[in-house]
Regions:
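Terminal-proximal interaction/regulatory segments of ATP-powered molecular machines
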Residues: 89, 93-327
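Conserved AAA+ ATPase small/helical "lid" subdomain
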Residues: 1-92
Length: 327
């Protein structure tokens, strides 16, 4: 079984069973409005991992996180309650069995699962497939591309991490340094430079560069104070714990990472193409020694870290390159 094949089937099945929230059932009308505004994918991610939409502000995010239990309870109260209709476990077992026997793939591949879901939607043999889409819900055929994109998000992260272009810890180190300088800037203090042993003014150029990447806007003082307040809030809620910026500011760290890889997109494309040549057993005479070794190392990391074999990697990476790394 290829990596993420079950994830694709499970995610599509969950999306097929979700219903839009009814804001009239909420005592907190603002929470009801936020819940009703969630797309099916956003609602699935909120239920599964407590992930809130990036498009929402800090106050909306907090209200939504605090109201997850109420959103779940509301969904259980309707006559046609959430989960009543949609793909059943039995139907998904049959679909996965069919996908595992797909003639175009040597294993249970995510692409085979997507193909079988598409065929299921075209057939319209089940009642839930004949539901009328509303506000993005019950759009079972439309969910296919959304699920594909979430799968490619995972493949993309695995591929980029496998290249070794930069270690994950580097983003944290940059953000740690940024927060240190912001904290001293707000307090009007100097920063101790461990290299020179001298107390120096906060690095305004570094702070401005990071803030540009984070989309801080023109009011940087407000942005900086918001960060420090968020850290203080985390410390109050988690007394005695070390503040983990990855938990407090996951989106900021993700933006730093995305910006780094955006600058290296062409290099990533070359590495991906070199890996595909290796998988196809094509001659690599035109590659430099360094490029050949990098492709080999990245392939081996994908095998060892993420459970790919040659066939499943060819399927996943080929799809990723075709959809996200076109020349």
């Amino acid at each position: 079984m290829a990596p993420h094949a079950m994830y694709i089937g499970a995610l599509w099945a969950v999306l097929s069973r979700l219903r839009r929230a009814d804001p009239e059932r909420y005592a907190d009308r603002q929470l009801g409005s936020l819940a009703a505004d969630l797309t099916p994918m956003e609602k699935a991610e909120l239920y599964a991992d407590g992930i809130t939409p990036k498009r929402m502000g800090a106050d909306e995010t907090l209200r939504l996180k605090n109201g997850i239990k109420e959103i779940i309870t509301e969904a259980e109260q309707a006559a046609v309650y959430e989960g009543l209709t949609g793909a059943s476990p039995r139907e998904m077992r049959t679909l996965l069995l069919d996908a595992s026997q797909h003639p175009e793939y040597s294993c249970l591949s995510p692409l085979a699962v997507l193909s079988c879901i598409r065929a299921l939607c075209r057939g319209g043999d089940y009642g839930f497939l004949r539901e009328t889409p509303s506000a993005g819900y019950h759009d079972h055929a439309g969910f296919i591309e959304q699920v594909r994109e979430r799968w490619l998000d995972r493949v993309d992260r695995e591929f980029r991490d496998s290249t070794g272009l930069v270690e994950e810890a580097r983003y944290g180190e940059l953000f740690d340094r940024y927060i240190t300088h912001v904290s001293h800037y707000i307090k009007g203090e100097r920063v101790f430079n461990r290299v020179t042993g001298v107390n120096e003014e906060p690095d305004r150029e570094m702070m401005a560069s990071v803030e540009k990447t984070l989309g801080a806007g023109s009011n940087t003082d407000t942005f900086r104070r918001g960060l420090i307040n968020a850290i203080a809030g985390y410390a109050i809620d988690h007394p005695g714990d070390k503040v983990e910026y990855g938990k407090v500011f996951p989106r900021h760290l993700e933006r730093l990472k995305e910006a780094y890889f955006a600058d290296r997109r062409k290099h990533l494309q070359e590495i991906g193409q070199d890996i595909m040549r290796r998988l196809a057993d094509e001659a690599q005479d035109g590659l430099s020694h360094d490029r050949a070794e990098l492709a080999k190392a990245a392939s081996e990391r994908l095998y060892a870290r993420y459970g790919y074999n040659r066939d499943s990697l060819r399927d996943a990476l080929g799809e990723l390159l075709a959809r996200r790394y076109k020349p």
